[in-house]
Amino acid sequence: MWVLINLLILMIMVLISVAFLTLLERKILGYIQDRKGPNKIMLFGMFQPFSDALKLLSKEWFFFNYSNLFIYSPMLMFFLSLVMWILYPWFGFMYYIEFSILFMLLVLGLSVYPVLFVGWISNCNYAILGSMRLVSTMISFEINLFFLVFSLMMMVESFSFNEFFFFQNNIKFAILLYPLYLMMFTSMLIELNRTPFDLIEGESELVSGFNIEYHSSMFVLIFLSEYMNIMFMSVILSLMFYGFKYWSIKFILIYLFHICLIIWIRGILPRIRYDKLMNMCWTEMLMLVMIYLMYLYFMKEFLCI
């Protein structure tokens, strides 16, 4: 019973955090574009996200006949994003999950299917094109992501995130494996469909992308799932390359740094062309990842690191 209560509290806190993450993003983008951002509703615009949420949820929703998949796909997307937060050690009771890295890779692999269903069931050319782009991008870059995570697992010799705390007491992977850190951050941006890799939501080409037919509460579920993934991947990146304890101030600062960096990149970089993205994956990044994997294997096997 105590575990269920802790899980419920964690999920509520994550959902509230999404609201303030959107406010932070709008504030940072506002200052990048030489404007103030939201500042009218109550104290410095702090309640702007809740006002937007009420407006979205109060909009009319049309229920179509024989449209179960149309409704369930955003729910599945939201559920998969929420389920990943089980790995977060809230009050320490989930601290020793033995195969937590494999669980994360499994959920990330499954998260492609709801977006594919959303695009296909919408019966819209723009949505279908957005979903097709997502599938091709995920097929290309999940290979790189798997090898990057496998390199780190080989270093710590474990499938659990818990080992990253003990392995990085003396030196951080962000320093020791700096090229791997940059490639991991790039793969994370692609996995999250963020600028400059947000090709499935290209406004100039696809109007709104895969979610063009969604509104009201179903759009809220898609929106929440995207921003929960941003927060979770920032947590994982901070853990795997810095190894600070979850409750430490250092971990929180590194986590906020990654969040702000993702938002800052959105404000300054243009969207990459699709063919250049595929070329970067198959001819450049995959080769670098494989070379680095062999280099780390040599270090572990012959230098006894």
Curated annotation (Swiss-Prot):
It is found in: Mitochondrion inner membrane. One of its GO terms (molecular function) is NADH dehydrogenase (ubiquinone) activity. GO terms for biological process: aerobic respiration. Disulfide bonds: none annotated. One of its GO terms (cellular component) is mitochondrial inner membrane. PROSITE patterns: COMPLEX1_ND1_1, COMPLEX1_ND1_2. Its EC number is 7.1.1.2. Its main location: mitochondrion. Keywords: Electron transport, Membrane, Mitochondrion, Mitochondrion inner membrane, NAD, Respiratory chain, Translocase, Transmembrane, Transmembrane helix, Transport, Ubiquinone. It comes from the Eukaryota. It catalyses: a ubiquinone + NADH + 5 H(+)(in) = a ubiquinol + NAD(+) + 4 H(+)(out). It is an enzyme of class 7 (translocase). The chain crosses the membrane at residues 1-21, 75-95, 101-121, 134-154, 173-193, 219-239, 249-269, 285-305. Core subunit of the mitochondrial membrane respiratory chain NADH dehydrogenase (Complex I) that is believed to belong to the minimal assembly required for catalysis. Complex I functions in the transfer of electrons from NADH to the respiratory chain. The immediate electron acceptor for the enzyme is believed to be ubiquinone. This is NADH-ubiquinone oxidoreductase chain 1. It comes from Apis mellifera ligustica (Common honeybee). The lineage of its organism: Eukaryota, Metazoa, Ecdysozoa, Arthropoda, Hexapoda.
